[in-house]
Structures are given as C-alpha cells and as structure tokens.
Amino acid sequence: MFTMKKSLLFLFFLGTISLSFCEEERSADEDDEGEMTEEEKRSIRDKIKTMAIDLAKSAGTGVLKTLICKLDKSC
C-alpha cells in the first residue's frame, strides 16, 4: 500500500510540474502575439515605399502627358 501511495504521489508531482511548464509557455506565447518583428516592420515599410513611388510615377506621367498635350494644342 505504501509503495502505491508513493508512486501515485510521484506521478502527481510530475503532472504538476509539467502543467506548470505548459502554463509558462502559453503565457510567453500570448505575450509575443502583439509584437511585430523588425523584419515585418521593414517589409511593411518597403511595400508602402514602393506603392508611393509607383503612385508618384503614374501621377508624374499623367501631368507630363497633360502638359505636352496643352503645349502642342492637340487636346
């Protein structure tokens, strides 16, 4: 009987420790969800920069076409 109690106590102890480790990992994972990595920030900045450059190019092209049209009086 004593051996059975001892082994059950040991199993309870191991289960408690493993549960504690799982809770620590879970709380660490929850903390990281809201943070963006530096690579993600850089990627977003690069996409915005590329979109702004493309927008400026297309706007500049439109202005130049309108200017050429007005100068040639072909509009």
UniProtKB/Swiss-Prot annotation:
Pfam families according to UniProt: Antimicrobial_2 (PF08023), FSAP_sig_propep (PF03032)
Q: Where in the cell is it found?
A: Secreted
Report the superkingdom from the record: Eukaryota
Hey, what's the signal peptide range on this chain?
1-22
Keyword Secreted found: yes
Q: GO cellular component annotations, sorted alphabetically? A: extracellular region
What is the annotated tissue distribution of the protein whose record heads this document? Expressed by the skin glands.
**Which residues are part of the propeptide segment?**
23-40
Where are the coiled-coil regions? none
Disulfide bond entries = none
Specify the protein name.
Rugosin-LK1
Question: Which species does this protein come from?
Answer: Limnonectes kuhlii (Kuhl's Creek frog)
Question: The organism's lineage?
Answer: Eukaryota, Metazoa, Chordata, Craniata, Vertebrata
